[in-house]
C-alpha cells in the first residue's frame, strides 16, 4: 500500500513540476522560456535541484532527454548568482568525448546565456587547424 501511494505521489509531483520550482535565477528562467521548454524533463527534475544545492551527481539518460540543460542551467545559475565566498568565483570547464557533442554543448550554452552579462563560451577541439 505504501509503495503504491509513493508511486502515485511521485507521478503527481512530476506532472506538476515546472522550471520555476527548480530554484534557478530569474534570468535563467527567462532563457528557458525563450528556448520554448514547457516543463523540465525527468533528468532535469532530478539533477538540477541537487546541482544547485552544490552536490556532485552522476546521471545517465537516453539521447534527447535534456541532459545538456540538466548540467548547463545550474552551471550558468551559479556563474550569475552572487558569490558566497570571496575569490575569483566559479568557472566551468566541460569536457566532451566528440567534436560534435562539444559543439552542441557550446551552442546550447550560447542559447541559454544569450541575455546574461559577462558569460563567454569557447569551444576548443583538437584535430583541426585554426
Which positions does each model-derived feature cover?
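Nucleotide phosphate-binding site architecture
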Residues: 38, 58, 76, 80, ...
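Charged, alpha-helix-enriched surfaces in structured cytosolic catalytic cores
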Residues: 23, 27, 42, 46, ...
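Conserved pre-motif I regulatory segment
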Residues: 13-60
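Walker A/P-loop NTP-binding motif
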Residues: 48-57, 69-86, 110-113
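The conserved Walker
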Residues: 61-65
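Conserved nucleic-acid-binding Ia/Ib motif block in the N-terminal RecA-like helicase ATPase lobe
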Residues: 30, 34, 85-130
Amino acid at each position: 500500500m505504501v509503495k503504491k501511494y509513493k508511486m502515485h505521489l511521485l507521478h503527481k509531483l512530476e506532472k506538476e513540476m515546472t522550471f520555476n520550482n527548480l530554484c534557478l535565477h530569474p534570468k535563467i528562467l527567462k532563457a528557458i522560456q525563450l528556448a520554448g521548454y514547457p516543463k523540465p524533463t525527468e533528468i532535469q527534475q532530478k539533477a538540477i535541484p541537487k546541482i544547485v544545492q552544490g552536490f556532485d551527481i552522476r546521471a545517465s539518460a537516453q539521447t534527447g532527454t535534456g541532459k545538456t540543460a540538466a548540467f548547463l542551467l545550474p552551471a550558468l545559475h551559479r556563474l550569475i548568482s552572487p558569490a558566497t565566498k570571496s575569490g575569483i568565483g566559479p568557472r566551468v570547464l566541460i569536457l566532451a568525448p566528440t567534436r560534435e557533442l562539444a559543439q552542441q554543448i557550446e551552442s546550447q550554452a550560447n542559447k541559454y546565456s544569450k541575455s546574461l552579462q559577462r558569460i563567454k563560451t569557447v569551444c576548443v577541439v583538437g584535430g583541426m587547424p585554426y
